């Protein structure tokens, strides 16, 4: 990019665009035009494409396997990139979240990442951790929220392609994930989770 910037006198940017609705729209049009084309998911699924250079949504349950691959790819972009850690239910507490963030920040060069739990809302009882379709307290139907790309929306409002992606999504299992690379030596706030009072 810097060569082109120098040659043409313009600024260029390499970005992993989110493509919220086009991942489905383009895959649907491509499937219609070329019935045998490969799209994300399994045969018979509603067609969709995986966002930018993200891994297939069902690639692994080990967050560090995914981070190892994405760390090499996403650092090539000059902006507009993010790694979403889809966690299903929330982490047990803020200390677990702080520990995971510290581990990622200490061992990876990724510029942006999110911890993205799924949660549900009951009109009567409020917040419920994870995907809970029926409130355990009153039996009412809930609204399930998850990150569609850069923001949260009720899953019921997603387009068919994003719904298929959500159905195929494998959530990272933090308890059964293991860091395989040697720990990098970086300056961090020592024992952050233990020292901070809430």
Model-derived segments and spans:
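Long, C-terminal-biased catalytic regions of enzyme "large/alpha" subunits
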Residues: 1-198
């Amino acid at each position: 990019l810097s060569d082109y910037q120098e040659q043409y006198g313009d600024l260029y940017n390499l970005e992993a665009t989110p493509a919220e609705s086009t991942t489905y729209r383009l895959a649907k049009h491509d499937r219609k035009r070329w019935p045998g084309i490969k799209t994300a998911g399994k045969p018979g699924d509603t067609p969709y494409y995986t966002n930018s250079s993200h891994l297939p949504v069902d690639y692994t349950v080990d967050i560090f396997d995914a981070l190892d691959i994405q760390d090499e790819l996403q650092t090539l972009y000059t902006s507009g990139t993010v790694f979403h850690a889809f966690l299903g239910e929330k982490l047990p507490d803020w200390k677990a979240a702080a520990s995971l963030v510290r581990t990622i920040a200490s061992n990876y060069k990724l510029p942006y990442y999110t911890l993205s739990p799924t949660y549900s809302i009951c009109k009567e009882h409020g917040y419920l951790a994870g995907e809970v379709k029926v409130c355990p307290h009153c039996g009412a139907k809930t609204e399930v929220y998850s990150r569609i790309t850069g923001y949260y929306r009720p899953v019921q409002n997603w387009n068919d392609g994003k719904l298929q992606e959500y159905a195929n999504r494998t959530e990272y299992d933090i308890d059964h994930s293991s860091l395989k690379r040697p720990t990098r030596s970086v300056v961090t706030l020592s024992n952050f989770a233990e020292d901070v009072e809430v």
